[in-house]
Amino acid sequence: MAAGRGRGGSTPFNVRGGRGRGQKGGRGSRRPTFEASRVAEAHHEGSSEDGSVHSGSDLDAEDQLEAPDESSPSSSDDEEDENKTEKPYNTLLQLFNAGQDAGGPARKRRKMDHNSKKVDVEVKGSDESDAEGLLLESEGEESSEGEEMEDMEDMPMDEVRTENSGDENDASDPFEIHFSNVDSTLLSQKIEAISSKGWQSHKSELPGKLRLMASQPNTEGHTIQVLPATQGVDNLKLKQKLANHAGDHISKFDSLASSLVPYMFGYQDLLFGARTLSNSAMFRDLYCLHALNHILKTRDRVLKNNSRLQKEPESDLELRDQGFTRPKVLIILPTRQACVRVMESISKLYQPEQQENKARFHETFSAADDKLWEHKPDDFRELFGGNDDDMFRLGLKFTRKTIKYFSQFYNSDIILASPLGLRMVMDKEDGKKQDFDFLSSIEIAIVDQADALLMQNWEHTEYVFAHLNLQPKESHGCDFSRVRNWYLDDQAKYVRQTLTFSSFITPEINALFSSRMQNTAGKIKATPTYEGAILDIPLPVPVKQTFSRFNSSSPVKDPENRFKYFTSTVLSSLIRSSTGRGGTPRASGTLIFIPSYLDFVRIRNYLATSSQTEHLSFGAISEYTSVRDVARARTHFFSGRHSVLLYTERTHHFRRYHIRGVKRIIMYGVPENPVFWGEVVGFLGLDPAGTAEAAEGGVRAMFSKWDALKMERIVGTKRLGNMLTEKGGDTFSFV
């Protein structure tokens, strides 16, 4: 059986969404710092080996990229609020001055021989069984015993030049344009336009009946340009190491990918609302390739500049090529098995000679599919197949020939995590130790399967984005003379690229697009044109599908207006159909589908206490109902003992039950996932003998104008307009 399915509730009291397997490594172990005028790290009593690092050229090239790990940096809420009122540059000066008196002996360097064969290396962390491991950055920190298998400083300089041949700086490279060759005046103009919501937009069509909306900051003299399609990886500005491998795994792009790749690799924000089982692997490979390309270009830029500073130690070179901390890419995923798929893409594109702790990664992250799920839908098996635990985090560190799993966050290049996994380490339970500085220098944020995250606890995702690219509270060994100016000016969130992939778009995802995706390079949104889920009903006979519109003046008042319409209009009809003469109960087989758990609780309590429903027998199944109570409710409903069954959308998402005995369906609101419409309506045909009767009972769904996004997926793009604005009536039927 796979690990327990995470079900982080949508209600505030449910913080956890699954079982965490965080493991403790060496919390006191020291981390090397940037080379040159770096801020010294305060000495920790529990530091490994000798404590600090070598200075100057004694640093190996990989260490020059790394910021030290503070074992338990913390700040009170009052301090956090106070910091928000200070100017960013003054804050950085205080951090810089605070670390000047720190020091310690140099760390011993360890050189190890290596061969050219691809091997997996296991490096065990200390105290892995300690429960505090849940609160550590990665699920098990790398040990100082597993020092680098390769030191670039041990390579002759001509070998370094050979490795980087063909990778010289290209002024037309989007990496150079977006991060290095930044016009500070133009950047400020774009940020000012974004802050005042001054976007200019252009709409166009994409292959596959998709609609594209491209937006750019509205600055004088700049207009939106529709980028030409890219046919294959040969047309991308890739590091040579990646180009060689990418061509073997990603040949030519299909028409959809060709249209979107220029924006992705051009560092524009992307909200893609048409993720499917057929295109998910392709887009996963593409965003992994983009992330690796960014990591390698950032790393090589720092190494080349380090070499320049070593050759000209007395020069006044100003080489700004870094952020505050090392992590540059954040990938947010719903489950551990999704993390395994991403790592498979990264490994095949990077082709490392060594992978440290790979076996341990597969042991703790991967699992076999449950054989009992063979009858489940394909999208269910993709999401919940294997290890479906939604409490995880993983740091990845890249060297020239190695991928190191379970590296500490401040020592990592890429962080892969679930929203809950990050929330647990960012916001400690004791409330005294908060640490999110490792998110201060994220330059690419990727959210895959955003629709699945909605069914966990979307508030965790919002919390993570609210803490991206904030000014750090600690120096973490940062060399401020190498930090890019837009970091120092607190403008990093306007340079960060965000890529979001979802099967459909909801108001919550739209809010993320509007408020958190503020890239000065621009942003695009790709959405499908829907035919409508009402056309794809798995029944042999036509089913009457009725939609009832109620008036709602605002989203805030919508829950109250919906409940009032249900109790005054829908419920009276329900009671008449489910009771006989004299108020005696009569089995009606009515299923009430409820998208929101809060609405479910309200309706359940009303049916249990209202005099209007005193003769109405009902059962209830929610995502929090025990297996035993679920079985009892289903049995009573099928036998007719309960004439009504309440059933939530999140229950269906996590379980995909087949409810028998359904003769009529009332939808308190249409589902977010259009696939659920056909599956729930399909309950009417589970008993072949009563299919005709059930089809006549049909479906009645309630909606308001605030359900426009959901309704578009259910009834189709063309039908939606009239249903929202029709003056002649508020009931619409389809057969």
Curated annotation (Swiss-Prot):
Keywords: Nucleus, Ribonucleoprotein, Ribosome biogenesis, rRNA processing. It is found in: Nucleus, Nucleolus. GO terms for molecular function: rRNA binding; U3 snoRNA binding. Its main location: nucleus. Residues 18-30 have a biased composition (Basic residues). GO terms for biological process: maturation of SSU-rRNA from tricistronic rRNA transcript (SSU-rRNA, 5.8S rRNA, LSU-rRNA). The keyword Plastid does not apply. Residues 59-69, 138-157 have a biased composition (Acidic residues). InterPro entries: P-loop_NTPase (IPR027417), UTP25 (IPR010678), UTP25_C (IPR053939), UTP25_NTPase-like (IPR053940). It comes from the Eukaryota. Transmembrane segments: none annotated. Residues 38-47, 113-127 have a biased composition (Basic and acidic residues). GO terms for cellular component: nucleolus; small-subunit processome. It holds the Pfam family UTP25_NTPase-like. Residues 1-173 are annotated as: Disordered. Belongs to the UTP25 family. DEAD-box RNA helicase-like protein required for pre-18S rRNA processing, specifically at sites A0, A1, and A2. Component of the ribosomal small subunit (SSU) processome composed of at least 40 protein subunits and snoRNA U3. PANTHER family: ORF PROTEIN-RELATED (PTHR12933), U3 SMALL NUCLEOLAR RNA-ASSOCIATED PROTEIN 25 HOMOLOG (PTHR12933:SF0). This is U3 small nucleolar RNA-associated protein 25. It comes from Paracoccidioides brasiliensis (strain Pb03). The gene is UTP25.
